[in-house]
Amino acid sequence: MGRFNVKFMIKDIEDEILCLRDNIRKWNKEYYVDSSPSVSDLTYDKALLRLQDLESKYPEYKTLDSPTLKFGSDLLNNFEEVTHSFPILSLDKAYDIKELLLWIEKMVLEGSSLGSYTGISVEPKIDGCSIVLYYKDGILQKALTRGDGRVGNDVTENVRTIKNVPLSIDEKVELVLRGEIYITKENFLKINHTLKNPYLNARNLASGILRRINSREVASFPLDIFVYDILYSSFGLSTNHDAFDKLKKFGFKINPFCKFFGGKNLEEITNHVKKIEMQRNSLEYEIDGVVLKVDSFILRDILGYTSHHPKWSVAYKFESCTGVSKIVDIVVQVGRSGKITPVAHVEKVFVAGAFITNASLHNQDYIDSIGLNVGDVVAISRRGDVIPAVELVVEKLSIGSFKISSNCPSCKMALIKEGSHLFCVNKHCPYRIIEQIKYFCSKKCMNIVGLSGKTIEFLFEMKFISSEIELYTFNFDRLINLRGFDLKRIDNLKRSISDSKGRPFRKLLLGMGIKELGANTILVLINNNLNSFDIISTLCKNKEAALAKLLKIKGIGEKIALNIIEAFNDKIILDKFNFFKELGFKLEEYNTNYVVDDSFLFGKKFCITGSFEGHSRDVLIEKITKKGAIFNRAVTKRLDFLLVGEKPGLKLQKANNLGIKTFGLFDIKDFVDLDN
């Protein structure tokens, strides 16, 4: 009996990990790509922490495509994508004073034990659009959005129009700064009132203005900025408060609520946090919390980074503001995977700076837990000040709880329950097909520009297309007399669809929407010579042999392997691939040396010794640090590795004495582009 219990426990753990990954990937897409998150920051962060904890305890289930190794993206098609010189990370979070105190105590303790504690800086967390400013010889060279943390959109010309961004500074220095572009509450309401399609909140308006193509238009809007961090400077700085003093002298705008606490009195720090929270509604701009940072740059260097956030900083998130509204309808949505999501439509209500008209209800269990139905008056919050959420029933005006139908709202097939969620398993379900076509056309897959979600729904409902493949056979000239389809738009659509034929095999494979098969897992397959449709489909004909081979590949778990095998025995998917093959699509990936995960270097402290044929040491240092590693000039016990070339010096002997790992160029070639 005991054996069975252990087996079931392990199976439950594996299922929980897979479920968490599914949810987090979905939430990442909703937040960073669709701009319509369905869960709160708190729910997201708890899920991410739970996944990190499980992967730490059960490393055998950790895969290279885990969302714990990645973070989201705000990249757009309209602006050039540029690689950041340094990783632009997120922040660790605390949701109550107790968590915040524990973090402060930890920083004080670690800093004091190392003799490098100088204090804590506290500043408001501005709810705006993140920007990175690059100065060379004292002149603004470029301004990039955060993007996915490694690559951002170049919005330099638009940022130049913001009056509080210095175009040049008095000293010929190099600087890389982080800031937050925002628009005041008053200006948000004034401008939003004049727009045909108003924005949900001030942050979205600021982001929308910043991404306008015409810089003259941007200049006509009152965007503003607070600078809050130095990522790099060509002059020496030892503390955050020294850095802020220097930035003020250069003419940068620093938030007036930024305050430095040099002592170890925790009460002083938390009182200032509470003061900012109390004054939140009276501020002229939106904030959603405060950020605490270790003041000493030396201590920051010692504490280091995770792949997600610096260990020397934390964001304390304020509780969301709430409003009261009435539920006028509950609709049920069907996702690409068949997952059923109930959504509440509510009477328009202004909550935390934005008008709310709908909110996700997650699943039937959630609805039952608060006893919700159409007609009820409910409390609505913007969790994390972003996501609309129904918190509770304030006034019960209906009978009982809303019940999701046992049949799919689209195809009417009986739903099945997996965990807390209902699913439609009909592969021919119209709603599922529409969502799959949207995914196929998305930037991350086939990048068919101009085919919006509404356009795809229109084409499907008019029976012009019934799957992805019909995008390539449909005569788009038939749309020319329809409203919204002029000749220019149709030509652009045809060109974009034609261009998609040249997308690499890995993008086409991703676009098939195979469950659990994400971009990184596809690169794992390719790196293990499963790099073409013919190779994978031939392998999967023998299911047992395919499973055995796939499970030998690091980063491929049983569930992913079974999903791949099932997909490559699915007539619908095989027919699609064969269609694309006949159309001349690339069904083979010729480059089989993709870097799947460069987090190996991220946050690692390294030093360098010796000479390297064909490579200058300065260039090597630059390339490695661009991957998130931290360069140290001397070998110390805190070093993670020493890069060793020909004729190494005494640094090698010291590293060996301290037990520090030593690497050659061969050891890092998979993580750093040494050829360019």
Curated annotation (Swiss-Prot):
Record's keyword terms, sorted: DNA damage, DNA repair, DNA replication, Ligase, Magnesium, Manganese, Metal-binding, NAD, Zinc
A Pfam family this chain is assigned to: DNA_ligase_aden
Protein residues bound to Zn(2+): 408, 411, 424, 429
SUPFAM superfamilies recorded: BRCT domain, DNA ligase/mRNA capping enzyme, catalytic domain, Nucleic acid-binding proteins, RuvA domain 2-like
One BP term from GO: DNA replication
InterPro entries from the UniProt entry: BRCT_dom, BRCT_dom_sf, DNA_ligase, DNAligase_adenylation, DNAligase_N, NA-bd_OB-fold, NAD_DNA_ligase_OB, RuvA_2-like
Disulfide bonds: none
Catalytic activity: NAD(+) + (deoxyribonucleotide)n-3'-hydroxyl + 5'-phospho-(deoxyribonucleotide)m = (deoxyribonucleotide)n+m + AMP + beta-nicotinamide D-nucleotide
EC id: 6.5.1.2
Cofactor(s) required, per the database record: Mg(2+); Mn(2+)
Keyword NAD assigned: yes
Coiled coil: none
Keyword Ligase in annotation: yes
Active-site residues, record numbering mapped to chain: 125
Annotated SMART domains: BRCT (SM00292), LIGANc (SM00532)
Molecular function (Gene Ontology), one example: DNA ligase (NAD+) activity
Domain of life: Bacteria
Binding site for NAD(+): 41-45, 90-91, 123, 146, 180, 293, 317
Family in the record: Belongs to the NAD-dependent DNA ligase family. LigA subfamily.
Job description of the protein: DNA ligase that catalyzes the formation of phosphodiester linkages between 5'-phosphoryl and 3'-hydroxyl groups in double-stranded DNA using NAD as a coenzyme and as the energy source for the reaction. It is essential for DNA replication and repair of damaged DNA.
Protein name in UniProt: DNA ligase
